[in-house]
Curated annotation (Swiss-Prot):
The gene is SCRL11. Belongs to the DEFL family. It comes from Arabidopsis thaliana (Mouse-ear cress). GO terms for biological process: defense response to fungus; killing of cells of another organism; signal transduction. It comes from the Eukaryota. This is Putative defensin-like protein 244. InterPro entries: SCRL (IPR010682). It is found in: Secreted. Keywords: Antimicrobial, Disulfide bond, Fungicide, Plant defense, Secreted, Signal.
Length: 86
């Protein structure tokens, strides 16, 4: 019984910590242009998600990506990323 209580308390503490960390993140718009079409690696949003991960870092955590086709086999990716702390 003690083990179950400790597990529940641990889960509650973890959920409070993760909720507080998520509130501290600030999201900034990011616009980048890449070669290729919007569907090079799947859906347009997934293609841009992978592009941003490759050009920035995983800590940028891109989300809500939109892809806009451009002339000359290029694409513009508009995503929200975690703002730099600088």
């Amino acid at each position: 019984m003690k083990g179950i209580a400790m597990l529940l308390v641990s889960c509650l503490l973890f959920s409070f910590l993760s909720t507080n960390l998520a509130k501290e993140l600030k999201w900034c718009p990011s616009k980048d242009v890449f070669n290729g079409s919007c569907t090079d690696t799947g859906s347009p949003s997934y293609t841009c998600f992978l592009d941003l991960l490759g050009s920035k870092s995983a800590s940028a955590m891109p989300k809500n990506c939109k892809c806009t086709p451009l002339p000359h086999n290029r694409r513009q990716c508009d995503c929200f990323v975690v703002c730099d702390s600088n």
